[in-house]
């Protein structure tokens, strides 16, 4: 349960925001998902609570009643050690109303930072984890992990190690994925904690690897090359890591806005494919499969799912109060479902290819420099004796690649069979001996028989 628009200021960690329903309706959702083989994880913001949370309220009341010059005593009020209070102002701190005290609040003064190095706070979060996991939740997305102890990767890894040990101790299948919005070298280190996954920010957002490649700001090779090199970066900290690729999220402009001009629909489609063909557990922000629009202020990035162009249709809602009024660039789900060439049906096709070939998600990437260039990338993905070849043309022109000398597993280029083809236009790929011609913005997946 939370107060403000973005719902990251928790007032009750063991309840559902009434705007979304009740614990009973949540249990129904869990059951319906599990019946369909879908696992459900919840977003857990441990870095901070709401300033309206009873823990903070009690700490604030205690400090307000404390005689001047007297030091706080946690035996009188344990909650005073749940947060970081100080008599001195520091960067990232806010003043406690009506007192000379300050408290850490990295995001804003309505979200005071919790002291996760305090054992009592850890016990609270173990109970909170128990509450949801015992109900049947399958794990958590951990919000803002680099702010647990702002500026100290080492301390943050220690805090995550405690939580990962606890959650995996209950069931090793419980899944933890962390948001650490920083550079790749830094978030790689967080794998040392034993969490399953870190969101792979390097590939995301309007200046990430995928958008740069699709916009022609970076060579196609950089996609394949980075997929290969990041594996070693992450595995050195945890050989059992599971990558968590994503393209956009609720804090980023939507990808349909990254591209302008006559090829923008093709670029929007293929950008989604480059995300969905990465290995690991891929995340897709709702509405990206429609090419929804939304940029600028946060509310615009969190517009309601575009089920129908009829605002009164089932499932449609108004969206956040401060959201701008804007028109969508592409059609609603209702219309796109009927159009075989829509972004929606393209994304469905990519997911089908991914699911039909488990090596895509599970395999190890090798970048094929000899067959890659400015406009085209080539990589292999291998898992337990299965091997496949991914070829992609990220440009607006057809490109030919000569695969002479290439073997995938034990199979020569000419003998590879077609596993999947993803096109954004009318043209299809052609194979003549070892030469493959890829139309604009297309992907070919070849494998062994």
Language-model regions, residue ranges each:
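Short, acidic/polar
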Residues: 119-133, 268, 272
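Acidic/aromatic-lined carbohydrate-recognition and catalytic surfaces
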Residues: 1-123, 134, 145-193
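Hydrophobic faces of well-ordered beta-strands that scaffold small-molecule active sites
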Residues: 40-42, 140, 176-178, 245, ...
């Amino acid at each position: 349960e939370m107060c403000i628009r973005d719902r990251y200021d928790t007032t009750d960690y063991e309840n559902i925001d009434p705007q979304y329903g009740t614990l009973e309706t949540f249990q129904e959702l869990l059951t319906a998902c599990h019946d369909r083989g879908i696992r459900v994880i919840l977003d857990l913001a441990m870095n901070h609570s709401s300033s309206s949370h009873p823990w903070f309220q009690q700490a604030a009341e205690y400090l307000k009643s404390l005689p001047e010059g007297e030091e706080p005593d946690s035996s009188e009020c344990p909650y005073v050690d749940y947060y970081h209070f100080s008599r001195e102002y520091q960067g990232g701190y806010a003043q406690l109303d009506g007192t000379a005290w300050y408290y850490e609040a990295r995001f804003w003064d309505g979200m005071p930072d919790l002291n996760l190095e305090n054992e009592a706070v850890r016990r609270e979060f173990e109970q909170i984890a128990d509450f949801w996991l015992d109900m049947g939740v399958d794990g958590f997305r951990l919000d803002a992990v680099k702010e647990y102890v702002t500026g100290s990767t080492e301390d943050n890894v220690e805090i995550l190690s405690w939580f990962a040990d606890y959650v995996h101790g209950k069931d090793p299948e419980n899944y933890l994925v962390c948001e650490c919005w920083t550079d790749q070298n830094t978030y790689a280190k967080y794998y040392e904690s034993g969490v399953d996954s870190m969101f792979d920010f390097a590939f995301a957002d309007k200046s990430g690897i995928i958008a740069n490649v699709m916009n022609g700001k970076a060579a196609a090779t950089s996609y394949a090359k980075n997929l290969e090199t990041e594996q070693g970066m992450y595995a050195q900290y945890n050989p059992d890591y599971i990558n968590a690729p994503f393209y956009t999220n609720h804090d980023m402009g939507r990808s349909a806005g990254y591209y302008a001009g006559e090829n923008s629909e093709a670029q929007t489609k293929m950008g989604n494919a480059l995300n969905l063909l990465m290995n690991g557990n891929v995340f897709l922000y709702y509405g990206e499969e429609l090419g929804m629009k939304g940029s600028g202020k946060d509310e615009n990035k969190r517009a309601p799912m575009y089920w129908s162009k009829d605002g009164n249709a089932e499932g449609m809602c108004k969206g956040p109060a401060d959201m701008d009024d804007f028109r969508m660039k592409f059609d609603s789900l209702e219309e796109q479902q009927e159009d075989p060439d829509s972004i929606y049906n393209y994304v469905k096709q990519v997911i089908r290819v991914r699911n039909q070939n488990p090596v895509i998600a599970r395999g190890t990437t090798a970048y094929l420099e000899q067959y890659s260039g400015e406009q085209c990338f080539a990589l292999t993905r291998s898992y337990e004796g299965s091997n496949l070849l991914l070829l992609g043309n990220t440009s607006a022109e057809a490109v030919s690649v000569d695969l002479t000398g290439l073997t995938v597993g034990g199979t020569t280029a000419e003998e590879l069979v077609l596993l999947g083809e993803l096109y954004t236009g009318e043209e299809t790929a052609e194979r003549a001996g070892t030469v493959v011609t890829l139309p604009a913005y297309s992907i070919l997946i070849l494998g062994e028989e």
